[in-house]
UniProtKB/Swiss-Prot annotation:
Signal peptide: 1-19
Gene: dsbD
Periplasmic topological intervals: 20-162, 229-242, 317-322, 378-383, 439-565
GO MF, one annotated term: protein-disulfide reductase [NAD(P)H] activity
Family: Belongs to the thioredoxin family. DsbD subfamily.
Lineage, broadest ranks: Bacteria, Pseudomonadati, Pseudomonadota, Gammaproteobacteria, Enterobacterales
Bilayer topology annotation: Multi-pass membrane protein
Gene Ontology CC: one annotated term: plasma membrane
Disulfide bonds: C122-C128, C182-C304, C480-C483
Stored HAMAP family: DbsD (MF_00399)
Protein name: Thiol:disulfide interchange protein DsbD
One GO process term, biological-process aspect: cytochrome complex assembly
E.C. designation(s): 1.8.1.8
């Protein structure tokens, strides 16, 4: 019995040993594309569901999903919102993980109609697949007017849009708006109206009435926030379109110009007059009348409040978040009401004296609003140009603040001026690098000199012309993030270049993914990119030396040493 157990253990160990002997050390750790993104479809008359089961550690690009009908007509396809993914070279992109279900409405399909579905994805470990195309056969569908409406796509774990400010900023903005020239001088008058002209109210009573007034104003703003957030939720996909983002950028820029005094934005004077008359008919000093006065006051926008309020509303529309929408506008109204409550309780002695500084506060808010166009444009133009826009905005703001501070006479302002000047110098650095190209020239001096090939025949010819030298073939594509990382961090390393000094360097750019590219990848049995192949002097590949996925310079140098005989 003991002998049998010993024999069984020996067989199991031998099996694992032999498996290890024949297991290629260079075998890819990544699965084929159909396992990474298991695609399936199901049609029921006009309704077609496309599904992707996405393997853990992999993701699909939202912008790379394309659907093209052949001999069929489909409704507009609305892709659900994904989650944001960011990398160094392509900036922010929306991706899908775990599972994606995409409903498609088929308005009409002839016999033999098909749907061509193209998609592309990557692995978190630094490996990207070429664009994959699937052909979906369609059952014949007769045109039906009821099916012509676009499908409402369920939002799969809809994330909150990543916006640059928290709702708490709205409170600070509201307080800041209170010190603009259109608002601050009105507070004593508003305080008198709220109290109904009664001078001998107790402090608690005066504070209560003012608080009720502020809550009425906050109710109006909160309702605006909820409505705009609900509208933004319905049109969330459209709000992410580049043309819409550019349009919003123009609107925000115009709002900022109004804060600089170049434009004037406010409600029509006739409408403001009607709202003011309605407010004046309310009885001051009573809770009900004060609340209605505050509600109406929230609709009366002065030139100083129109631009910030519009900016916050558009900001909320971008989020599509109901809680954020209502909460942000409530805090904004509360911020505007805090100075009024203080004045009502403590009197005008707390008010700072009016002067040019109020115009400077208004101008400063113009720069705050200008930050939103930069944030929106960053999604369209990428992080590189986005950084340059942030740099330009920083230089403009700190430069303006420095010039404005020169009018101050107090000694401690000299310290502030030095800080502002230093901040402007730091902000200008990205623009300086762009203008003089310092970083670019440093990088271009260290690239490897690859010979480009395109087809299988060109590869075979290059292997023959190597004349006994070892050959390295780098498969590259513009859509491959890790390929760019190889270029920037690995191939630029002096140790890597030294190790490849006696190696013939070939590169195949398969960005187009055309028939020749597909044939080359199939011939070499390549799943995705980056993939680097090594051939000996006789033109035979060493499969165990194949590299799939990104390697840093140190790891790649060690890999090159290990492959040497």
């Amino acid at each position: 019995m003991a002998q049998r157990i010993f024999t069984l253990i020996l067989l199991l160990c031998s099996t694992s040993v032999f498996a290890g002997l024949f297991d290629a050390p260079g075998r890819s750790q990544f699965v084929p594309v159909d396992q990474a993104f298991a695609f399936d479809f199901q049609q029921n008359q006009h309704d077609l569901n496309l599904t992707w089961q996405i393997k853990d550690g992999y993701y699909l690009y939202r912008k790379q999903i394309r659907i093209t009908p052949e001999h069929a007509k489909i409704a507009d396809v609305q892709l659900p919102q994904g989650v944001w993914h960011e990398d160094e070279f392509y900036g922010k992109s929306e991706i899908y993980r775990d599972r994606l279900t995409l409903p498609v409405t088929i308005n009409q399909a002839s016999a033999g109609a098909t749907l061509t579905v193209t998609y592309q994805g990557c692995a978190d470990a630094g490996f990207c697949y070429p664009p994959e195309t699937k052909t979906v056969p369609l059952s014949e569908v007769v045109a039906n007017n009821a099916a012509s409406q676009p499908v409402s796509v369920p939002q799969q774990e809809q994330p909150t849009a990543q916006l640059p400010f928290s709702a708490l900023w709205a409170l600070l903005i509201g307080i800041g708006i209170a010190f603009t020239p259109c608002v601050l001088p009105m507070y004593p008058l508003i305080s008198g109206i709220v109290l109904g002209g009664k001078q001998r109210l107790s402090t608690a009573r005066a504070l209560l009435l003012t608080f009720i007034y502020v809550q009425g104003m906050a109710l109006t703003y909160t309702a605006l926030g909820l409505v705009v957030a609900a509208a933004g939720l319905q049109f969330q996909a459209a709000l992410q379109h580049p043309y819409v983002l550019i349009g919003l950028t123009i609107v925000f820029t115009l709002l900022a110009m109004s804060m600089f005094g170049l434009l004037t934005l406010q409600l029509p004077s006739s409408l403001q007059t009607r709202l003011t008359l309605m407010s004046n008919r309310q009885q001051g000093g009573s809770p009900g009348g004060v609340f209605i006065m505050g509600t109406i006051a929230g609709l009366i926008c002065s030139p100083c409040t129109t631009a910030p309020l519009s900016a916050i509303l558009l900001y909320i529309a971008q989020s599509g978040n109901m809680w954020l929408g209502g909460g942000t506008l409530y805090l904004y109204a509360l911020g505007m009401g805090l100075p009024l409550m203080l004045i009502t309780v403590f009197g005008n002695r707390l008010l700072p004296k009016s002067g040019p500084w109020m115009e400077q506060v208004k101008t400063a808010f113009g720069f705050v609003i200008l930050a939103l166009p930069v944030f929106l444009l960053e999604r369209v133009i990428g992080d590189v140009w986005g950084l340059r826009l942030w740099s330009a905005l920083g230089v403009a703001f700190f430069g303006w603040a420095f010039i404005t501070s020169l009018q101050a006479k107090r000694g401690w302002m000299r310290v502030v001026q030095i800080i502002l000047l230093a901040a402007a110098l730091v902000s200008v650095r990205p623009l300086q690098d762009w203008a003089f190209g310092a970083t670019h020239t440093a990088q271009t001096q260290t690239h490897l000199n690859f010979t480009q090939i395109k087809t299988v025949d060109e590869l075979n010819q290059a292997l023959v012309e190597a004349k006994g030298k070892p050959v390295m073939l780098d498969l590259y594509a513009d859509w491959c993030v890790a390929c760019k990382e190889f270029e920037k961090y690995t191939f630029s390393d002096p140790q890597v270049q030294k190790a490849l000094a006696d190696t013939v360097l070939l590169q195949a750019n398969v960005t187009a993914n055309d028939a020749q590219d597909v044939a080359l990848l199939k011939h070499l049995n390549v799943l995705g990119l980056p993939t680097i192949l090594f051939f000996d002097g006789q033109g035979q590949e060493h499969p165990q030396a194949r590299v799939t996925g990104f390697m840093d310079a140190e790891t790649f140098s060690a890999h090159l040493r290990d492959r040497q005989p």
